[in-house]
Amino acid sequence: MVEPLLDGLVLGLVFATLGGLFYAAYQQYKRPNELGG
C-alpha cells in the first residue's frame, strides 16, 4: 500500500511548515528593532 508513504509526505510537509514559521518568528524575535518595532 502507499499509505505509509503518503503519511510520511504529509508529516514532512507539516513539520517543514511549522519549522519555517518558528524560524521566522525566532528571527523576528531575535532582532525586533530592525523593523522599527
From Swiss-Prot:
For this protein, the parts annotated as crossing the membrane are 5-25
**Per UniProt, what is the membrane topology?**
Single-pass membrane protein
A single GO BP term for this record reads: cytochrome complex assembly
MF terms from GO for this chain are: electron transporter, transferring electrons within cytochrome b6/f complex of photosystem II activity
Q: The organism sits in which domain of life?
A: Bacteria
- Record GO cellular component, one term: plasma membrane-derived thylakoid membrane
Q: Does the keyword Transmembrane apply?
A: yes
> What does the UniProt entry say about where the protein is found?
Cellular thylakoid membrane
Q: Which UniProt keywords apply?
A: Electron transport, Membrane, Photosynthesis, Thylakoid, Transmembrane, Transmembrane helix, Transport
List the NCBIfam families: PRK00665.1
Q: How does it assemble?
A: The 4 large subunits of the cytochrome b6-f complex are cytochrome b6, subunit IV (17 kDa polypeptide, PetD), cytochrome f and the Rieske protein, while the 4 small subunits are PetG, PetL, PetM and PetN. The complex functions as a dimer.
**HAMAP family per UniProt:** Cytb6_f_PetG
Q: What does this protein do?
A: Component of the cytochrome b6-f complex, which mediates electron transfer between photosystem II (PSII) and photosystem I (PSI), cyclic electron flow around PSI, and state transitions. PetG is required for either the stability or assembly of the cytochrome b6-f complex.
Q: What family does this belong to?
A: Belongs to the PetG family.
- According to UniProt, the name of this protein is Cytochrome b6-f complex subunit 5
Give the originating organism: Mastigocladus laminosus
Tell me the gene name. Answer: petG
